[in-house]
From Swiss-Prot:
Top-level class of the enzyme under EC nomenclature: hydrolase
Recorded GO MF terms: ATP binding; ATP hydrolysis activity; four-way junction DNA binding; four-way junction helicase activity
Name of the gene: ruvB
Organism listed in the record: Bifidobacterium longum (strain DJO10A)
Designated name of the protein: Holliday junction branch migration complex subunit RuvB
Binding, ATP: L37, R38, G79, K82, T83, T84, E145, D146, F147, R188, Y198, R235
Region (Head domain (RuvB-H)): 272-348
């Protein structure tokens, strides 16, 4: 399986998020370093059992019919394995994969150039497909449905459109914002898969597999401690495992015990709930400085010394999902769970 990669630039929110150890966005050279941890077959992909069963049936049917499969949309939060699944699909089908992203496609012509160079059966993986320019989306509609692109020849009033037939190929789109995809584009995907956050048990299995690949000898319970801090996200789990590996190397540890995991990640201010410095600062401010809330976003951001957008888009989603905080029309309110953690039992 050959592969061509074109990674686009991240947006501002992603840049803020990427500064955190518990970010679900890639940090630094992670797209490259993660390659060694990626499974190459569907059977080696840990987690998402229902999705795997559906995808296996989908691919088996395409192989038996001896035709490229329908287009695939992979939707879900970042860091759950959408890119890995796209690579697995191409590998299972034994076809090349071309990789690009929505931000990397600046003009419709960029996408037309990629499409016109595809071979029969090739997979085109478009990460962040919801960020394609409108003109590129419209070109992709036709390419996915009719396997052709219309090439403009000439300029001005004399310009004409010449249809260029494309070989049958498969688009795999990945998105963290499925709702931002136009309905005509969504309708052209024959298979849509939704990835969910991982339960601790599945994350432990994934961590143990990654530890074997990286040569990290984890003691009983160590994978569990890592899973607790990984926010249900494989990308975060693998990142934290690498930092624990660094700790083990520096301290000449043959076996990494649970206490070693706790001590190593405490250095990065990550607690057993997966909360980091910013999360703790936000919750601490709501509970102690604002008596549990409600508090407005701007006041909360000023209290923790961050931009309002950073608090809202980078910090709050996890705190709300895990039940530490709720958003109300009057502002942010800490839950009983946050009150207990921060030792505040005052009645509101």
């Amino acid at each position: 399986m050959s592969e061509t990669t074109d990674y686009g630039a991240s947006n501002t929110g992603a840049n803020e998020e990427s500064l955190r150890m518990v970010s679900s966005q890639p940090i630094g050279n992670e797209p490259v370093s993660d390659e060694e941890l990626r499974p190459h077959v569907l059977g080696g992909f840990i987690g998402q059992p229902r999705l795997k069963a559906q995808l296996q049936l989908f691919l088996d049917a395409a192989r038996k019919r001896d035709v490229p499969p329908d287009h695939i949309l992979l939707a879900g939060p970042p860091g759950l394995g959408k890119t890995t699944l796209a690579m697995i699909v191409a590998n299972e089908l034994e076809v090349p994969i071309r990789v690009t992203s929505g931000p990397a496609v600046q003009h419709a012509g960029d996408l037309a150039s990629i499409l016109s160079s595809l071979d029969v059966g090739e997979v085109l993986f478009i990460d962040e497909i919801h960020r394609l320019p409108r003109a590129a989306e419209e070109l992709l509609y036709i390419a996915m449905e009719d396997f052709r692109v219309d090439v403009m020849v000439g300029k001005g009033p004399g310009a004409s459109s010449i249809p260029l037939t494309l070989p049958r190929f498969t688009v795999i789109g990945a998105t963290t914002r499925e709702g931002m995809l136009p309905s005509p584009l969504r309708a052209r995907f024959g298979f849509t898969a939704h990835l969910d956050f991982y339960p601790h048990e599945e994350l432990e299995k994934l961590i143990e597999r990654s530890a074997n690949v990286l040569g990290v000898n984890l003691d009983t319970g160590s994978a569990h401690e890592l899973a607790l801090r990984s926010r249900g996200t494989p990308r975060i789990a693998n990142r934290l495992l690498r930092r624990v590996r660094d700790w083990a190397i520096v301290h000449d540890l043959i076996v990494v015990r649970p206490d070693d995991v706790k001590e190593a990640l405490a250095l990065y201010q990550i607690d057993s709930e997966g909360l980091d410095r910013l999360d703790i600062a936000v919750l601490n401010a709501i509970v102690r400085n604002f008596n549990g809330g409600p508090v407005g976003l701007n006041n909360l951001a000023a209290m923790v010394g961050e931009e309002s957008e950073t608090v809202e888009t980078v910090c709050e989603p996890y705190l709300v999902r895990e039940g530490f905080m709720i958003r109300t029309p009057k502002g942010r309110v800490a839950t009983e769970l946050a009150d207990i953690i921060f030792g505040n039992y005052a009645q509101r």
